Swiss-Prot record:
GO terms for cellular component: cytoplasm. GO terms for molecular function: ATP binding; pantothenate kinase activity. The lineage of its organism: Bacteria, Bacillati, Actinomycetota, Actinomycetes, Kitasatosporales. It comes from Streptomyces coelicolor (strain ATCC BAA-471 / A3(2) / M145). It is an enzyme of class 2 (transferase). Belongs to the prokaryotic pantothenate kinase family. This is Pantothenate kinase.
Length: 329
């Protein structure tokens, strides 16, 4: 008599991983992908690139940002190859000389996206294939303070509606069109406003990095209901810097403390008034700003764009990247 095959509990079966559009990698797995890419930055250079309150060091650059610079170098090369194929297809009409490779960097206030953008600029400019790398922040496309006040938007500064989104999209579109020279407004964190009569000039870089809270936001429909082209439609690659909301809040408050002891001391600083009250009063203001402006903007507008990124960097409580998710091709 043949004995019946015992049933195997469902939990004992090997579970097939759920299919996702991303390849998920641990820090060690990602770090191994740098291959033999040399580290072109010194500790002093990293220190200068690091944002206030950020803890990026040479190990973080070596483990996280070197592999990313290698990946981006491969993307740029592949794009050049595709451009050559397109020129071959177009024949006599295929005289494209190439347009800048555009990278978007998004994430919350205080999450460290500005440091990520500066590191990428420094690392990518060391590759001989693309030495000219420009970095533009979306702060320059905030509406001037006078305009924000007139529209009742000062308490919404940083929300999508506080930007001149049409001008920002046009700026990147002109870069992508290959225009010889494109200009952008300049923002000053000291005066908390656009600097009058000052422009940033961008002249056909190999790579353009666009960094800001809302760079991955989809375009709003026009008044006629038609879908518009959005800023992110011009990106060749995008990075979202992610972390737990509680950690970002703690980093934000720590950064505010340090700014109060340094930059806010400048007599020209918009925030100097917070150096003339007690630390607890100043921190109460910072907590209120987080609770009423930065956190709602993160939850409503910034975090929902995470799924649009090519690469998601997930930071732990110590500001170090722990996991990464890379979109499949």
């Amino acid at each position: 008599m043949i004995s019946p095959v015992p049933s195997i509990p469902r939990s004992a079966h090997r579970q097939r991983p759920e299919a996702t559009p991303y390849v998920d990698l641990t820090r060690p797995e990602w770090s191994a992908l740098r291959d033999k890419t040399p580290l072109p930055l010194t500790a002093e250079e990293v220190e200068k690139l690091r944002g206030l309150g950020d803890v990026i060091d040479l190990d973080e650059v070596r483990d996280i940002y070197l592999p990313l610079s290698r990946l981006l170098n491969l993307y740029v090369g592949a794009t050049d190859g595709l451009r050559g194929a397109l020129n071959t297809f177009l024949g006599e009409q295929g005289s494209q000389s190439g347009t800048p490779f555009v990278i978007g960097v998004a994430g919350s206030v205080a999450v460290g996206k500005s440091t990520v953008a500066r590191l990428l600029q420094a690392l990518l400019s060391r590759w001989p294939e693309h030495p000219r790398v420009e970095l533009v922040t979306t702060d320059g496309f905030l509406l001037p303070t006078r305009e924000l006040e007139a529209r009742g938007l000062m308490s919404r500064k940083g929300f999508p509606e506080s930007y001149d989104r049409r001008a920002l999209t046009r700026f990147v579109a002109d870069i992508k069109a290959g225009k010889a020279e494109v200009t952008a407004p300049v923002y000053s964190h000291l005066i908390y406003d656009i600097v009058p009569d000052q422009r940033l000039v961008v002249r056909r870089p190999d790579i353009l990095i666009v960094e800001g809270l809302n760079v991955l936001q989809p375009a709003l429909p026009g008044k006629d209901g038609r879908t518009r082209v959005g800023l992110a439609d011009y990106f060749d690659f995008s990075v979202y810097v992610d972390a737990r909301t509680e950690d970002i809040e703690r980093w934000y408050l720590n950064r505010f403390r340090k700014l109060r002891a340094t930059a806010f001391q400048n007599p020209s600083s918009y925030f100097r008034k917070y150096t003339q009250v007690s630390e607890e009063e100043a921190l109460d203001y910072a907590r209120t700003t987080w609770r009423t402006i930065n956190k709602p903007n993160l939850v409503e507008n910034v975090a929902p764009t995470r799924g649009r990124a090519t690469l998601v960097l997930r930071k732990g409580p110590d500001h170090k990247v722990q996991r990464l998710s890379l979109r499949k091709l």
